[in-house]
Curated annotation (Swiss-Prot):
It catalyses: L-homoserine + acetyl-CoA = O-acetyl-L-homoserine + CoA. One of its GO terms (cellular component) is cytoplasm. The lineage of its organism: Bacteria, Bacillati, Bacillota, Bacilli, Bacillales. GO terms for molecular function: homoserine O-acetyltransferase activity; homoserine O-succinyltransferase activity. Keywords: Acyltransferase, Amino-acid biosynthesis, Cytoplasm, Methionine biosynthesis, Transferase. The active site is at C142 (acyl-thioester intermediate), H235 (proton acceptor), E237. The record marks S192 as: Important for substrate specificity. Transfers an acetyl group from acetyl-CoA to L-homoserine, forming acetyl-L-homoserine. It comes from the Bacteria. GO terms for biological process: L-methionine biosynthetic process from homoserine via O-succinyl-L-homoserine and cystathionine. The record marks E111 as: Important for acyl-CoA specificity. This is Homoserine O-acetyltransferase. Belongs to the MetA family.
Length: 301
């Protein structure tokens, strides 16, 4: 089945060129199928890039999936055209009365700030509280994961002496969880962050299970025991060249602490190697199937 997105969304042409089945809203309306309704709170600066990355990972599902894009009303994005936001995005006041099968809260390059210093923190708290009753399962990514752990469970983020930057090997710790079904014992995930999770606080929360971790990058995948909250500290949605673009950006800024991303380039080459795409797709498919589709009633009350 296809993903159902607006006809003129820029990601549509990219996904179709990759032979991902995309259906516009008018055609989907005439199919007698209840689509999975996913809302994406996109906090990343390059919104079109993030839209494409996430839709690509969810586009191989046998389910029909309909997407709604959300931005905070208390923050004005600087890197995306107003016309794009007006056409494809909505705000919380317009959807708070609705229910969604799944929700994705993306990362944001604001980890240097305390959560309470983030301009849209109060609105984000309201959205996360709303998600507990109006969303079947919520997937938090990178800073979104840190924000979710802090809000829901009081787990704080900690500043790291060096940026966690590269593609790191991870081990599956809980092999019987549905979210990691089909995973190899070792798999790879890109990371790009200056902060980590307070492990002492995390391990003291009985409602959470740690599913995967890396010796170099720390805990990666955490899930609440009721499967409603999923926390992902890395960026498996990243394109092959995303870390390279971030590295070149930091070099241009003349940051003194810039180091090349670890385990990212082919040996003896400056070309990156994508070793995470298959597991990234499997992770998103497992979440959509086991935590969203199988847990949501056909008709919500």
């Amino acid at each position: 089945m296809p993903i159902n997105i607006p006809t003129h969304l820029p990601a549509k042409q990219v996904l179709e060129s990759e032979h991902i089945f995309v259906m516009d809203e008018s055609r989907a309306f005439h199919q007698d199928i209840r689509p999975q309704k996913i809302i994406i709170l996109n906090l990343m600066p390059k919104k079109i890039q993030t839209e494409t990355q996430l839709l690509r990972l969810l586009g191989n599902s046998p389910l029909q999936v309909h997407f709604t894009f959300l931005i905070p009303s208390t923050h004005t994005p600087k890197n995306t055209a107003r016309e794009h936001l007006d056409e494809f995005y909505t705000t919380f006041s317009n959807i708070r009365h609705k229910r969604f099968d799944g929700m994705i809260i993306t990362g944001a390059p604001i980890e240097h700030l305390a959560f309470e210093e983030v301009s849209y923190w109060e609105e984000l708290k309201e959205i996360m509280e709303w998600s507990k009753t109006n969303v079947t399962s919520t997937l938090h990514i990178c800073w979104g994961a840190q924000a979710g752990l802090y809000y829901h469970y009081g787990v704080e983020k900690i500043q790291m002496p060096k940026k966690i930057f590269g593609v790191f090997e991870h081990t599956v710790l809980s092999k019987h969880e549905r979210l990691v079904r089909g995973f190899d014992e070792l798999y790879y995930v890109p990371h790009s962050r200056h902060t980590d999770i307070n492990m002492e606080q995390l391990q003291a929360v009985p409602e959470l299970n740690i599913l995967t971790a890396s010796k170099e990058a720390g805990v990666c995948l955490i899930v609440s025991k009721d499967e409603k909250q999923v926390f992902l500290t890395g960026h498996p949605e990243y394109d092959t060249n995303t870390l390279l673009q971030e590295y070149e950006r930091d070099l241009e800024r003349n940051l003194s602490t810039v180091e090349a991303p670890k385990h990212y380039f082919a040996k003896g080459s400056n070309e990156p190697v994508n070793r995470w795409k298959a597991h990234a797709t499997l992770l998103f498919m497992n979440w959509l199937n086991y935590y969203v589709y199988q847990e949501t009633p056909y008709e919500w009350d």
